[in-house]
Amino acid sequence: MDEPRETAGAQSLRRALQLLRLLAEHHEEGIKLTEVIAASGLERSTVHRLLSCLAEEQFAERDPDGKAYRLGIDAMQMGFASMRRVPLVDS
């Protein structure tokens, strides 16, 4: 079977989604920039740029002390919206 091809021009989106998944995994305690860099394997400048954009769009937020990131309000609202639509158990 052929491997699925990546959608052309979607590298930044895939990277941002990777970061959102990391933020979700560490939402309660937050995750430091250095930990995001290590876990993602991305360059520091790339991670910083993507997290800054996600924060501007309220999909990520920084702790008041600025040391950790977690999901932002818009990411959580999307999760809540999906919970209302999709049944938790299939019939």
Residues of each region from the PLM?
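N-terminal helix-turn-helix
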Residues: 2-85, 89-90
